[in-house]
C-alpha cells in the first residue's frame, strides 16, 4: 500500500464512522461568546473555566510583557530563553503549590511526554488509569517501560498491578479531573496504594488547577495529596496556555539534564509568563474565590435542570458536564441543532472517547450567566435530550 493509499484508507474509515475531525475558523472563541462569521453563539465548548482569557489585567500584563521583552523568548531556556519573567513564574508556582521547584513547559502535552520519557526505563513499569489523557498514554506506550492500565478509578486493580513483581521502579499515572467524563480521581486512596508499593505518583491536574481546592490549588490540595510529580496546565483555569511540572529539587535538576522537550524547545514568550503571573494573582486572590463560587453555582444549576434529560449525564461535579448520547451521528446532529438555537456545543466521538459513548462535552465557565444555563437546558429539552 502506497503512502497515498494508506492516507486515503484511513480518512475513508473515519468518514464512514462519522468520526472525521474538522476545525472551524472562529472570530472569537474564548469567553462567554463565540463568533463564527457574522453569527454569535453562547459558548459551551471552552476550557476557559474561570473566564480569565479576557480578563483586562491579564491582557494588559501580556501587553506590558511584550513591550518589555518582545514577542518571543529567542531560544531554549538552556541557551538564552530563560528570563526573569520565567524565573518569577516558576518561583510563584512552587511557593503556591508547596513544592521546591516548578519547571515551565510550552504545553501540557509536552510536559507529560517529557516527564515519562525522561524518568522511565526498560525495567520499570507504568501503571496508568485507562482514561488518562492521550499525552500520558502515548508517552507511556512509547516508553521502554512496561505499560499496564487499570480500569477507570479502580483502586483495587491499581493495587493488584502494583503488587506484581517489577525489576525496576513503578510510576502510577492518573488525572485530577478527567477531561472527557469530568469526574475526579480518588487521589487519597490512589496515593495510599502507591506509597504502600514504594512507587511514585504522577497527577495531571490540567482540569482541576485554579478551579478546585483552597485558593484554586487544585485536586491534590483538595484531597490532601502531594504526588512526587504534579503537572498543571495553563490553558484551562488560567485562561492562557503552557504548563509546569512541580517536583523536588533533585528531580527538577534531573529534568534539566534529561527532559528533551524542555531542553530542545524554544521557551514560552516572556510576555506569556508575565500574563500567567497576573493570572495566578487573580486565581489565588479574592476575585478567584468569587469566580470559583460563581462557577460552582452554575454547575449545580445545570445539574439540577439536566436531571430530567433523556441523555445520560455523568456524576461530574466539575465544569465539564458530558451528555452521553452513544451514537456518533446522533451526537453530531444534536450538536448542530444546538448551534442552530445559538448554543455552541462540540460533539466528542471515538477514538477520543470509547466506542458507543459519543457525547456532547458541555463546559461551563464563570463567564456564563444563569440565563445562559437556563437557555442551554431549554434547548436540550426541546431537542429531546
Curated annotation (Swiss-Prot):
Pathway: Cofactor biosynthesis; biotin biosynthesis. The keyword Repeat does not apply. One of its GO terms (biological process) is biotin biosynthetic process. It holds the Pfam family Aminotran_1_2. The keyword Thylakoid does not apply. Pyridoxal 5'-phosphate binds at residues 108-109, 179, 207, 233. Its EC number is 2.3.1.47. It comes from the Bacteria. It is an enzyme of class 2 (transferase). Substrate binds at residues 21, 133, 352. Homodimer. Catalyzes the decarboxylative condensation of pimeloyl-[acyl-carrier protein] and L-alanine to produce 8-amino-7-oxononanoate (AON), [acyl-carrier protein], and carbon dioxide. Belongs to the class-II pyridoxal-phosphate-dependent aminotransferase family. BioF subfamily. This is 8-amino-7-oxononanoate synthase. It comes from Pseudescherichia vulneris (Escherichia vulneris).
